[in-house]
A protein has these predicted regions:
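Dual-mode signal for accessory low-complexity, basic/Gly-rich regions
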Residues: 128-129, 142-315
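Active-site bordering "gate/hinge" segments
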Residues: 1-169, 176, 185-188, 266, ...
Length: 315
């Protein structure tokens, strides 16, 4: 496969774990007893690679270990995919930057979330805005409509009608017509996402969210990712999270993490085997800088961002 050849040619120590290409055409039709009958078709193209290399560090956490990473591109249309050269370069760099990781010291520092990690955070956040969690009293955002729950610069919405985006749809899984919905406006929670059942429980109308989000959009800011990193004298660039320490009922947030340490505004050594911790409430208020470059490979459309203080538990 050409992508595999391009990637392995960049660094002799790399070995391919998987390279793939897929294309898909799907058709959705919904009919119900209320007389609704409609449908639509959509396409999806995806190409990617994951690679592995041995970590030859003689000291530190990675001694004798293998490091793996990769990159992929997904889009509704084939001509919107990233070039194979770009995918190969990112897969190579993302893997090599993990070599020789150390464990950071325990501290409180700013954390820059890569777009992928921003997406993970917003996915958890959005579940707290779903009506089924709210009426079951399993959301830290219960009874918070109209209140300031986040930094006033945050604008978050669900946008089902965006052209070419992966979460776009004309109706939800109950046949309710999809319309744009503002969730957070100037930091205030203004809507929940409701199915018909959840809406009835909360004495509200369905917002067309049976089946979950469509395209969840965090409005971009003005900073490049490099500028976000430059804004931090001593902190973390977060590239990976693991574990299940997320509680949308209480708002507690604790995840295993990997990343790169930021020193004097520049990426320094890789770090791993530590946890980051805070609460959703604090993180939303402390999310103070938002990037400009949106990752469109997922229905959660978000740029990277900075949270100005989180706890790091390391050595």
């Amino acid at each position: 496969m050409e992508l595999e050849e391009l990637t392995l040619a960049l660094e002799s120590s790399l070995r391919s774990e998987q390279a793939y290409y897929s294309d898909l055409v799907s058709h959705t039709v919904h009919a119900d007893s209320n007389g609704f009958l409609d449908g639509y078709s959509k396409t999806l193209y995806s190409v990617g690679i994951s690679v592995v290399t041995e970590d030859k560090a003689t000291t530190g956490l990675n001694t004798g270990r293998k490091q793996t990473d990769g990159w992929f591109s997904s889009a509704r249309f084939w001509d919107k995919l990233e070039s194979l050269e770009s995918i190969a370069d990112k897969a190579c760099q993302r893997t090599l930057r993990k070599l020789g990781a150390t464990k950071p010291t325990t501290c409180e520092v700013p954390v820059v979330f890569s777009a992928e990690m921003a997406r993970s955070f917003l996915a958890s956040c959005s579940s707290a805005m779903m009506g089924d969690h709210v009426f079951r009293k399993q959301s830290f955002l219960m009874d918070k409509l109209g209140e300031l729950i986040a930094n006033p610069q945050i604008q978050l919405s669900d946008q089902p009608l965006l052209s070419g985006m992966l979460g776009s749809r004309y109706f939800d899984s109950e046949g309710v017509i999809a319309t744009p919905l503002t969730l957070i406006e100037d930091g205030k929670l203004v809507n929940y996402m409701l199915s018909t059942y959840a809406g009835n429980k909360l004495k509200m109308k369905s917002t067309g969210h049976a089946g979950g989000i469509s395209n969840l959009v965090l409005e971009p800011g003005k900073y490049t990712e490099e500028e976000l990193i430059c804004s931090v004298d001593n902190g973390l660039y977060l590239t990976s999270m693991s574990g299940q320490g997320v509680n949308v009922t209480t708002g507690d947030y604790s995840r295993g993490a990997q990343g790169l340490w930021i020193r004097d505004g520049k990426l320094a050594e890789p770090v791993s085997e530590f946890t980051i911790a805070s609460t959703f409430q604090q993180m939303l208020h402390n999310l103070d800088l938002i990037g400009s470059e949106v990752d469109t490979r997922n229905p959660i459309l978000t740029p990277p961002f900075r949270i100005n203080k989180m706890s790091i538990s390391g050595t």
